[in-house]
């Protein structure tokens, strides 16, 4: 990834960075909750974004 990025690419990377986090613990505590973990987590070395 180059140090000179377009704004569009930068926005895209920022969104992916925000998506790549675990679910909050209070969501797991909710009644009737079936979500255990964030299944859409992405590891930087294993799965690339396809840019």
UniProtKB/Swiss-Prot annotation:
Q: Which GO terms describe its biological process?
A: translation
Single annotated GO MF: structural constituent of ribosome
Gene Ontology, cellular component aspect: cytosolic large ribosomal subunit
The protein's UniProt keywords, in alphabetical order, are:
Ribonucleoprotein, Ribosomal protein
Q: Where is the signal peptide?
A: none
A Pfam entry, by short name: Ribosomal_L39
Asked if the Swiss-Prot or TrEMBL record annotates the protein with the keyword Ribosomal protein, the reply is yes
Q: Which family does it belong to?
A: Belongs to the eukaryotic ribosomal protein eL39 family.
Name of the protein this chain belongs to:
Putative ribosomal protein eL39-like 5
């Amino acid at each position: 990834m180059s140090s000179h990025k377009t704004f569009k690419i930068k926005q895209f990377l920022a969104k992916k960075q925000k998506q790549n986090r675990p679910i909050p613990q209070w969501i797991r505590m909710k009644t009737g909750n079936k979500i255990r973990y964030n299944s859409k987590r992405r590891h930087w070395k294993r799965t690339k974004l396809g840019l």
